[in-house]
Regions:
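Blade/loop signatures of beta-propeller domains
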Residues: 1-5, 158
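Beta-strand-rich domains and repeat architectures in extracellular enzymes and scaffolds
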Residues: 4-46, 76-77
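Conserved beta-strand position repeated once per blade in WD40 beta-propeller domains
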Residues: 21, 77, 137-139, 183
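Residue-level detector of Asp-centered blade-edge/turn motifs that repeat once per structural unit
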Residues: 24-26, 81-85, 142-144, 188-189
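A flexible loop/linker signature enriched in serine peptidases of the S9 family
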Residues: 33-45, 63-75, 84, 90-100, ...
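Short loop/turn segments that connect beta-strands within beta-propeller blades
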Residues: 48-52, 104-107, 163-167, 215-219
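Blade-edge beta-strand/turn elements of extracellular beta-propeller
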Residues: 168-175, 220-230
Length: 235
């Protein structure tokens, strides 16, 4: 949990309030905002969804540049997953060029102060070593404490995993994609992964293939299948 409580939050003093990279998990809103005066200093904030006048709680310190450069055009730079009664906050940091995460628990409503809605269960951890490439933020966490994601290294996309119990680890490359990939997702039990693949000159919203794969007990993927429907895939 950050102790930089005195840092100015620009969003709170702006006449026109806006949220950047908005996420809603349960009754908590998460977003990104600048801190300090530098354009490369930002943090993740949170507040209750139904309390518009609640003062934002800053969840990450100013030492991160939370940004997504995946495939050159980026996207959302963090993800929050509610798992095992906790909030798993995962973000991409451009200073270390690595994946970080922190675990929070929700403060009971009758104990919430004006500025505190989530308590840190675990201090921030740098999950991955720095990579010469970019991460996507469509992360998935399994019940076995593995994080799955997609990254690009040397202009090739990979499905990878990280052990949530370890720090500063090499990414474990599970699959090398033939073309571009993104939008990683899973079913509730995280026994099935899905993602989309596409090839140039198309963008993913123009033409793509939806793929599925099962995850075995060791975290490896098996039985990769491409979704096929003559009507949907028709040119």
């Amino acid at each position: 949990m950050s102790n930089d409580d005195q840092l100015k939050v620009r969003q709170t003093v702006s006449k026109k309030k806006s949220f950047k990279e908005l996420t809603i998990v349960r009754d908590i809103i998460f977003w990104i905002d600048l801190v300090g005066e530098g354009q490369n200093e930002n943090a993740i904030f949170a507040r209750p969804f139904n309390e518009k006048e609640a003062f934002p709680q800053k969840l990450t310190s100013k030492k991160y540049n939370i940004k997504n450069n995946f495939h050159g055009y980026g996207g959302k730079s963090y993800k929050c997953i509610y798992l095992k009664n906790n909030f798993y906050l995962i973000w991409i940091d451009q200073i270390t060029n690595a994946v970080w995460f922190q675990i929070f628990k929700e403060v009971a409503s009758n104990y919430r102060s004006q500025k505190r809605y989530l308590d840190s269960v675990q201090e921030p951890r740098q999950l991955s070593k720095s990579i010469d490439g970019n991460f996507d933020s469509s992360f998935v966490i399994s019940q076995k404490n593995f994080l799955y994601g997609i990254c690009e290294i040397n202009n090739r996309d990979y499905l990878f995993s990280l052990n949530l119990k370890k720090t500063k680890q090499d990414i474990y490359r599970i699959k090398k994609f033939k073309n571009f990939a993104g939008e990683l997702s899973s079913n509730t039990s995280v026994s099935l992964l899905s993602w989309v693949e596409w090839d140039s000159p198309y963008m993913p919203w123009e033409k793509n293939d939806l793929c599925f794969a099962q995850i075995d007990l060791d975290g490896e993927i098996t039985k990769i299948k491409k979704f096929s429907d003559k009507l949907i895939n028709a040119k």
